[in-house]
């Protein structure tokens, strides 16, 4: 059995892996896991990943979870162009620096924005107070300021003059609040221009394909009561 990727393009880390594999022509079998149907909560899925999360990479008997680990595995195994994850010590460290920061900063805030603005009230039928939503969006704004001020600055891409894994991970995170209707690029010309460069670098068709699901998140159908009961505690823990 060749390379298998268990993904749902509703998930921002899954989108990053999907784009990376497609852009670098890495052959893989897509195993779609529909999160909104609770497929990740099944006993069968738990046999693949006891954490019951996507993404998952399966390469023969080797199973790997966690999106950054998967991206690095693919970059190393398939000898992708150096700009994605450079050999140069300091250039590589810059990519690592961003990937270390984003987990608890940009990712958390983008995830909370999507769930507080759309997925909790629309998909799970759970109201979110205006105060909670305002706090969430203010924290997202602060993370965007750091993204622009510390990481992007006046460069073409987050870590230099070429696209890297840092840019790919960042843009897929930012499309979460975009999918919720947040104007994250409005009033931020540097970030808006960076987004255009990232889209051009990966290819606009591939970019749109990967983000079709998240851009329709507002149209999600309400979860059935049984699924809601199973999902709600996990969701609340995830977005704390």
From Swiss-Prot:
Subcellular location field: Cytoplasm
Species: Bos taurus (Bovine)
Annotated glutathione binding sites: 40, 53-54, 66-67
Subunit structure: Homodimer.
InterPro entries: Glutathione-S-Trfase_C-like, Glutathione-S-Trfase_C_sf, Glutathione_S-Trfase_N, GST_C, GST_C_Theta, GST_N_Theta, GST_Theta, Thioredoxin-like_sf
Catalytic activity: RX + glutathione = an S-substituted glutathione + a halide anion + H(+)
Alphabetized UniProt keyword annotations: Cytoplasm, Transferase
Gene Ontology CC, one term: cytoplasm
Enzyme class: transferase
Top-rank taxon, per record: Eukaryota
EC annotation from Swiss-Prot or TrEMBL: 2.5.1.18
GO BP term, example: glutathione metabolic process
Phylogenetic classification of the source organism: Eukaryota, Metazoa, Chordata, Craniata, Vertebrata
The encoding gene: GSTT1
UniProt name for this protein: Glutathione S-transferase theta-1
GO terms, molecular function: glutathione transferase activity
């Amino acid at each position: 059995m060749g390379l298998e990727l268990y993904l749902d393009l509703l998930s921002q880390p899954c989108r990053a892996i999907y784009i990376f594999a497609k852009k670098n022509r890495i052959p893989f079998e897509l195993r779609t896991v529909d999160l909104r149907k609770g497929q990740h909560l099944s006993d069968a899925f738990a046999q693949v990943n006891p954490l019951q999360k996507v993404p998952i990479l399966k390469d023969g008997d080797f199973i790997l979870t966690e999106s950054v680990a998967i991206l690095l595995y693919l970059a190393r195994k398939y000898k992708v162009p150096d700009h994605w994850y450079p050999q140069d010590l300091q250039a590589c460290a810059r990519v690592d620096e961003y990937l270390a920061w984003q987990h608890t900063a940009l990712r958390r805030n983008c995830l909370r924005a999507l769930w507080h603005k759309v997925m909790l009230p629309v998909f799970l039928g759970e109201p979110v107070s205006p105060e909670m939503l305002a706090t969430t969006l203010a924290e997202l704004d602060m993370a965007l300021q750091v993204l622009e001020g510390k990481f992007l600055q006046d460069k073409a891409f987050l870590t230099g003059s070429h696209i890297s894994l840092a840019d790919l991970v960042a843009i897929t995170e930012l499309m979460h609040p975009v999918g919720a209707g947040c104007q994250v690029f409005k009033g931020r010309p540097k970030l808006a221009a960076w987004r255009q460069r990232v889209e051009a670098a990966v290819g606009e068709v591939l970019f749109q394909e990967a983000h079709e699901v998240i851009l329709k998140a507002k149209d999600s159908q309400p979860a059935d009561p049984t699924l809601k009961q199973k999902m709600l505690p996990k969701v609340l823990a995830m977005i704390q």
